[in-house]
């Protein structure tokens, strides 16, 4: 027969909860603390994610989901109305100014419709976008500053820029402007479509021009499905219209782009088991941390109220009903604890986020208010609460009325009696007491150990960030000076006008403090190598369609052996620069010999420094023939007519560049190397070889310095930084510089961010550990009040009792220290091996400093906490304590 007694059970639970006000306060605080942990971490994570996305969008140049590049007008009209597309925007690139004052800024002149302008952060704060049929233009305050024009509507400005190799000078009327954002790589001058077409007609460029992009249609889109699977949707749109983006040589190929700024797109494209495991492990860690404290709170409650639950059995209460009482109390307390934790967690996360983001260069500071934060934190906290009260509920449900009245913690455990010659000591009693409730002891020791392990992992993680490895990836020497265009993305190919004069080097050297330095000579002449057709195709397949490739091979000259002529990249390096190369195979010693006919073949590497051994054809010991071209003629293969320059070839004709006057020089490949990005050309597309600097000048007859790299003393670093900043800004703005100090600052900011995040998490987990330690001691003393009273009644001194409790506390601390040390030593190398695969600049260095600092703190807690708890419990007399239990 089923009795409807739910109302009675709820009343019992409510009244017993009202009688335990202290317990309620502790439980609410425990639940709130767990919710704070979830909410603050979710807030920080979501805020940093949003900030990273905004930062990434600015680096990408916009926040559209993806796009289709270099389209014909027909392809554009075909794709833009696909059902998967929610909104679309169109842009046509026209040209770029590269001369002073734009040599240090990336400025693009183009047409963009309203959607595209908005997605590129080109929303005028004053005025509007340009109207068709006018000479209007809109731009940002940085471009206006470079032009020396005040941001006033109606202002006229004139600018010269390159359009597909042709320089044009145009005058515009300012119709709108927006504030300059230094995080955005490219600045824009937006003009009407009619003016863009007129400029293309003026210079004689037919889209897509010689460069394959000028005047072509670029379609950017916002997808109906959002950012969850951008790449798949882009591919599906192409498939819907008979195109693809995988085989660059195929006639149906269209170049596409996925906005990597969306973390959802990154996860969908790069999701691997290690990422899933890492996220799951972090969530489980947080749940377990919250579980430890809430579980102990309810365990204390059940221990204190054990007689109450036993007596409920005498009036017919079932174990399931008693579990429901505890669960009801937990849910009621959650109604107070979870909202409090949500508010406090969001406020704490909101305060921590700016501190963390301030360490991250370029990340937009913002505090997320996403509903995901609050819903997720509330659900995780609720699950943690329900898990935490299950075992205490089972304990209450299992106890019988007689057992409840006689209950002493651990009293139900039966063990074999050991006979020994030694007497009982306070230490042995303390050890035995810990064994009476092994589950509680394990939970407490684990909780304390978790804090130590987490702190040690955090310190080892941030300590493993190798500044030398990070900085050397971007800057090989303390300072590197070059023409400003050499540091610009999309800048000019190195030429004679970009060379560093000796006078500039002399001015730098005159500052003093330079310990060593050297130059890298750049190629300003025509030079060819001859390669097989297979390598020619492999090296260029990403840039041409199959039809274009076949035509290119038809128009490419061959030598007597039938090998194809191909552009080659050469540089001459002094000893200082050669010292900074990474040797993959062979020996660089022969390149230190002036005049030696030896070269190093340059191989590409990935972000982790792993060489890509298929990025070059040359192998150790190969003979490379370099053809230094002094005079070239341009022959129409169909008519055989030769022209002196490409400009002389009729627009409707093809031509083959054929060397007329040249020198062939043979070199032996002495080494295979990787070049630091800071000393490289910073653009690719041709096989590259490095020569000795004197050999380079002797064989090429040129001496244009591309880079001057040098190191300084620590004392002179600051002065040199200040000098170069002023020199390149005010004295000689044609040149610019990079320094290790800049990248070191970025590195320290990133490391500080991880230290702050890890430190905050370690503090919260450590606080939970200390609270659990306090709870464990409190539970043990409360549950054994009668036992202590009996011991004192038969002659045990209060001092002895306190000593025994101190021993218990020290054993907890010792156990936590031992377990944390073992876990760190066992799992540290394994975990950090995985970290090293994620962060290419990570080098594992074990340090136990956190352990050595925290261990004495735990020992001190092991002494103070038991004494403090015992002092509050022992205020009653022995007789009162005996009567209280009986």
Descriptions of predicted regions:
Residues 754-768, 779, 788, 822, ...:
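Hydrophobic multi-pass inner-membrane translocation pores used for secretion
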Residues 20, 292-333, 769-811:
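Interfacial "coupling" helices/loops that link adjacent transmembrane helices in transporter permeases
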Residues 46-266, 463, 470-758:
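Basic-flanked hydrophobic alpha-helices used for secretion and membrane insertion
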Residues 32-39, 43, 290, 330, ...:
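Small-residue faces within membrane-embedded alpha-helices
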Residues 1-26, 300-321, 348-374, 383-455, ...:
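Feature of multi-pass inner-membrane transport and sensor proteins
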Residues 48, 271, 338, 342-376, ...:
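Short helix-loop junctions at transmembrane helix boundaries
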Residues 269-286, 372, 748-765:
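N-terminal membrane-entry
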Residues 3, 10-18, 24-30, 40-66, ...:
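Cytosol-facing boundaries of transmembrane alpha helices in integral membrane proteins
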């Amino acid at each position: 027969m089923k009795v409807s007694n739910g109302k009675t059970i709820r009343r019992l639970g409510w009244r017993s909860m009202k009688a335990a006000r202290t317990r309620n306060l502790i439980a609410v605080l425990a639940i709130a603390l767990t919710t704070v942990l979830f909410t603050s971490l979710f807030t920080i994570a979501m805020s940093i994610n949003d900030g990273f996305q905004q930062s990434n969008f600015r680096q990408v140049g916009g926040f559209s989901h993806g796009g289709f590049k270099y389209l014909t007008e027909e392809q554009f009209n075909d794709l833009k109305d696909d059902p998967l597309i929610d909104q679309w925007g169109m842009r046509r690139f026209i040209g770029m100014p590269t001369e002073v004052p734009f040599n240090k800024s990336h400025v693009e002149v183009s047409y963009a419709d309203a959607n595209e302008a908005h997605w590129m952060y080109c929303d005028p704060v004053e005025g509007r976008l340009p109207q068709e049929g006018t000479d209007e233009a809109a731009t940002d305050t940085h471009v206006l500053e470079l032009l020396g024009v005040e941001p006033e509507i109606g202002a006229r400005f004139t600018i010269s820029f390159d359009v597909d190799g042709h320089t044009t000078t145009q005058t515009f009327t300012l119709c709108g402007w927006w504030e300059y954002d230094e995080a955005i790589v490219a600045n824009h001058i937006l003009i009407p479509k009619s003016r863009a077409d007129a400029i293309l007609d003026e210079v004689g460029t037919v889209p897509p021009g010689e460069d394959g992009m000028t005047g072509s249609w670029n379609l950017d889109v916002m997808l109906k499905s959002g950012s969850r699977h951008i790449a798949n949707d882009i591919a599906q749109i192409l498939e819907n219209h008979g195109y693809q983006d995988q085989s660059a040589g195929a006639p149906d190929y269209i170049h596409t782009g996925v906005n990597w700024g969306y973390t959802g797109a990154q996860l969908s494209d790069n999701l691997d088991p290690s990422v899933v495991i890492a996220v799951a492990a972090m969530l489980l860690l947080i749940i377990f941390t919250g579980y430890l404290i809430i579980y102990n709170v309810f365990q204390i409650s059940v221990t204190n109220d054990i007689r109450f639950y036993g007596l409920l059995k005498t009036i017919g209460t079932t174990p399931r009903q008693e579990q429901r009482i505890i669960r009801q109390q937990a849910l009621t307390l959650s109604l107070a604890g979870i909202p409090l934790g949500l508010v406090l967690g969001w406020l704490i996360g909101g305060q921590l986020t700016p501190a963390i983001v301030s360490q991250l260069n370029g990340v937009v500071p913002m505090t997320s208010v996403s509903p995901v934060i609050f819903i997720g934190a509330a659900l995780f906290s609720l699950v943690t609460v329900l898990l935490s009260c299950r075992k205490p509920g089972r304990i209450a449900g299992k106890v019988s009325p007689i057992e409840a009245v006689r209950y002493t913690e651990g009293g139900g455990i039966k063990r074999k009696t050991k006979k020994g010659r030694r007497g009982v000591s306070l230490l042995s009693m303390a050890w035995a007491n810990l064994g009476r409730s092994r589950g509680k002891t394990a939970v407490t020791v684990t909780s304390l150990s978790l804090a130590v392990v987490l702190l040690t992992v955090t310190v080892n993680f941030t300590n493993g960030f190798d500044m030398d490895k990070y900085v050397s990836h971007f800057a090989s020497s303390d300072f590197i000076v070059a023409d400003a265009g050499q540091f610009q993305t999309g800048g000019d190919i190195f030429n004679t006008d970009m060379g560093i004069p000796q006078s500039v080097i002399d001015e730098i050297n005159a500052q003093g403090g330079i310990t060593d330095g050297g130059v890298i000579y750049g190629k300003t002449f025509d030079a060819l190598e001859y390669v097989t057709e297979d390598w020619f195709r492999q090296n260029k397949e990403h840039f041409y369609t199959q039809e274009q490739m076949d035509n290119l091979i038809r128009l490419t000259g061959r030598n007597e052996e039938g090998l194809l002529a191909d552009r080659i990249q050469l540089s001459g390096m002094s000893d200082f620069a050669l010292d900074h190369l990474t040797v993959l195979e062979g020996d660089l010693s022969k390149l230190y010999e002036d005049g030696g006919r030896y070269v190093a073949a340059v191989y590409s590497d990935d972000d982790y420094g792993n060489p890509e051994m298929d990025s070059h054809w040359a192998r150790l010991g190969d003979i490379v023939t370099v053809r230094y071209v002094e005079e070239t003629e341009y022959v129409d293969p169909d008519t055989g007519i030769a022209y002196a320059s490409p400009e002389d070839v009729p627009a409707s004709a093809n031509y083959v560049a054929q060397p007329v006057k040249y020198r062939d020089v043979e070199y032996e490949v002495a080494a295979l190397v990787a070049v630091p990005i800071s000393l490289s050309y910073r653009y690719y597309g041709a096989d590259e070889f490095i020569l000795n600097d004197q050999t380079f000048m002797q064989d090429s007859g040129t001496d244009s310095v591309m880079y001057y790299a040098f190191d300084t003393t620590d004392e002179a670093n600051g002065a040199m930084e200040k000098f170069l900043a002023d020199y390149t800004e005010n004295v000689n703005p044609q040149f610019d510089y990079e320094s290790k100090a800049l990248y070191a600052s970025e590195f320290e900011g990133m490391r500080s961010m991880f230290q702050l995040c890890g430190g905050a998490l370690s503090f919260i987990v450590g606080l939970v550990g200390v609270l659990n330690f306090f709870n464990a001691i409190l539970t043990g003393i409360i549950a054994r009040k009668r036992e202590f009273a009996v011991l004192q009644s038969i002659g045990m001194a209060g001092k002895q009792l306190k000593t025994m409790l101190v021993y218990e506390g020290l054993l907890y601390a010792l156990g936590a220290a031992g377990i944390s040390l073992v876990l760190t030593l066992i799992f540290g190398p394994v975990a950090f091996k995985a970290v090293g695969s994620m962060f290419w600049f990570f080098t594992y260095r074990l340090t136990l400093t956190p352990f050595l600092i925290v261990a004495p703190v735990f020992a001190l807690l092991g002494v103070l906490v038991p004494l403090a708890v015992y002092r509050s419990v022992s205020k009653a007399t022995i007789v009162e304590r005996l009567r209280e239990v009986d």
